[in-house]
UniProtKB/Swiss-Prot annotation:
With S4 and S5 plays an important role in translational accuracy. Interacts with and stabilizes bases of the 16S rRNA that are involved in tRNA selection in the A site and with the mRNA backbone. Located at the interface of the 30S and 50S subunits, it traverses the body of the 30S subunit contacting proteins on the other side and probably holding the rRNA structure together. The combined cluster of proteins S8, S12 and S17 appears to hold together the shoulder and platform of the 30S subunit. One of its GO terms (cellular component) is small ribosomal subunit. The modification 3-methylthioaspartic acid is found at D102. It comes from the Bacteria. Part of the 30S ribosomal subunit. Contacts proteins S8 and S17. May interact with IF1 in the 30S initiation complex. The keyword Signal does not apply. The gene is rpsL. GO terms for molecular function: rRNA binding; structural constituent of ribosome; tRNA binding. Keywords: Methylation, Ribonucleoprotein, Ribosomal protein, RNA-binding, rRNA-binding, tRNA-binding. This is Small ribosomal subunit protein uS12. One of its GO terms (biological process) is translation. Belongs to the universal ribosomal protein uS12 family. The keyword tRNA-binding applies. It comes from Mesoplasma florum (strain ATCC 33453 / NBRC 100688 / NCTC 11704 / L1) (Acholeplasma florum).
Length: 137
């Protein structure tokens, strides 16, 4: 605990924190070729590689992910949620923040049902997360 005199001399410093999705907080001014700080909920990008990865220790699967080059020039790994996908190299996708706990280095999710990404077929529950339309009665 600091003394009163120490607090009078220097105030308490607010704790600094690091963002968990840095690619969403970076923009590029292509005319001036400068990096700018923008806060975006999503970013668009082009898939450079679509592959599978095995998860960390207690889990076992082949999780699908894509390496995406974003409009701000960064390359990130993004998880492809849901069963089955139509993504391949040069597909245009929209990513959002949100890590996958058992995949190291994957801090983003691809949004299903937008741009070149198709929605998950035959999805009845949690449809909005997978871009699925409401089924006809």
């Amino acid at each position: 605990m600091p003394t009163i005199n120490q607090l009078v001399k220097t105030n308490r410093k607010a704790k600094t924190w690091k963002t968990k999705a840095p690619a969403l907080n970076r923009g590029v001014n292509s005319l001036k070729k400068k990096v700018t700080k923008v806060s975006a909920p999503q970013k668009r990008g082009v898939c450079t590689r679509v592959a599978t990865m095995t998860p960390k220790k207690p889990n076992s699967a082949l999780r699908k992910y894509a390496r995406v080059r974003l409009t701000n020039g960064m390359e990130v790994n993004a998880y492809i949620p849901g069963e089955g996908h139509n993504l391949q190299e040069h597909s245009v996708v929209l990513i959002r923040g949100g890590r996958v706990k058992d995949l190291p280095g994957v801090r983003y999710h691809i949004i299903r049902g937008t741009l070149d990404t198709q929605a998950v077929n035959n999805r009845k529950q949690s449809r909005s997360l997978y871009g699925a339309k409401r089924p006809k009665k």
